[in-house]
A protein has these predicted regions:
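C-terminal structural segments of small proteins and small subunits
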Residues: 87-102
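Short S/T/G/P-rich N-terminal loop/turn motif that feeds into the first structured element of a domain
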Residues: 1-65, 72-82, 105-115
Length: 115
């Protein structure tokens, strides 16, 4: 699914986000993935803003534990996911966890008009 992007050229660059839903089947083996993926994400400026240790689904069905990871830009979020290192890290979670990841561009509201 693609959508048109708002023109934010006059504003500060919007951040990029990974919206992740993870179903972890083998927590002890999942640590192998996190020990590799965590530093790769951090190297791209990524940081976990929220994780679903405590979460309430108020509408619909959520396909796993939610995570929200922020990057300095949409391009950085894409670059991290597409990097050779992260693609290798994905193999560490095969059979251990299932992920659904959406990369989104943050919204930067237009600057206020002077009064």
């Amino acid at each position: 699914m693609t959508t048109s992007r708002p023109d934010n050229s006059h504003d500060a660059a919007p951040k990029g986000y990974w919206i992740v839903f993870a179903t972890i089947n083998e927590p002890s083996r999942f640590d192998n993935y996190t020990s590799v993926a965590g530093p790769l994400i951090a190297a791209q400026g990524g940081r976990v803003l929220a994780r679903g240790d405590v979460a309430t689904v108020v509408e619909g069905t959520v396909p796993g534990r939610p995570y929200l990871i922020e990057f300095p830009s949409y391009a950085a979020a894409q670059a991290c996911f597409n990097s050779a290192g992260y693609q290798e890290a994905i193999a560490l979670r095969d059979g251990v966890a299932q992920f659904q990841i959406v990369i989104v561009e943050g919204f930067v509201p237009p600057a206020s008009s002077p009064r």
